[in-house]
Amino acid sequence: MNYPLKSLKIIFIFLLIVAQFPASVVASEYASEIFYKIRTESNSSSESIGSYSKGCLSGGMYLPSHAEYYDVLKPSRNRFWGHPDLIEFIELTSEQIFNEFGNGLLIGDLSMPRGGPMPYGHKSHQNGLDVDIYYEKKPEFQMDRFKLETYNPKSLLSPNQREINYKLWTDYQYDLLKITSKNDRVARVFVNPLIKNEICKIAIKKGDTDWLKKIRPWGGHYKHFHVRLTCPEGSKDCINQAPIKQSDGCGIELQSWLQKDKVFESNSTKIKEWMLLSELPNSCKNIIRD
């Protein structure tokens, strides 16, 4: 069928408008909704982009749900993706813990397949460099899919959340945090302020405080601690946090946390959905279309 030239021009202009339409719609959507809907990794090279709380992940790797040295809880959330450095860190650390203590690790959330803001649970975990690790040891029995989804690790705090539960606290938790924080890749380890206070008391008594500065007090974090790695080589658009002060963090700063309600803050804070894709680094727009 032959179309008049004028009609062809109209069709061409219409197609140009339609081609641009998805981009304009995506730019106005909440970023958490966009990234949550993407169920697979991007095809581009591995890079952590932007900051931990305003970024995305290129070429993410997934962490298998089962391994000899660890299990990943709640795999249906699809938050088991990270930069290759993070995946390697988890694999090597869990193997080290197994070799030294005879138990594996329970792993919580990493990032979504392409990072980005999550609709609930975390404000960070956006650029593939954050992981939650539980204080509780990996059970000796084989965890099936149902167990991985429903297993609920115990809190290290007492039921009133005002002190350490010494029925659960052992030297293992102290050693686990020490091994983790002394890793050169680790930038920070976030723990509940009461847990930071406990390890400060033990470390000061032992004269073993050189590793404490990376252990940062933060609300919640009574079932798990949050490990954050430094920006990897080759991730030119990754933004590190400011350097930590040369202090063990057991003084005035910690005391201010212990006096605040933040000690008892829930781990399941609802995330505001106001962050738009346009607020993330420009590279993130390409990542969602890759």
Where do the PLM segments sit?
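Bacterial N-terminal signal peptides that target proteins for export
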Residues: 2-12
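Extended, low-complexity, intrinsically disordered C-terminal regulatory tails
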Residues: 34-37, 89-121, 190-212
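Active-site acidic/histidine clusters and adjacent loop/turn architecture
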Residues: 36-108, 169-176, 183-186
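Acidic/His-rich structured neighborhood in mature extracellular/periplasmic domains
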Residues: 112-166, 227
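Sec/Tat signal peptide C-region and signal peptidase I cleavage site
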Residues: 21-27
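Extracellular/periplasmic catalytic domains that process cell-envelope and extracellular macromolecules
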Residues: 98-100, 124-129, 181, 218-221
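Catalytic cores and adjacent binding grooves of peptidoglycan-active enzymes
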Residues: 28-32, 148-290
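Bacterial N-terminal signal peptides
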Residues: 11-20
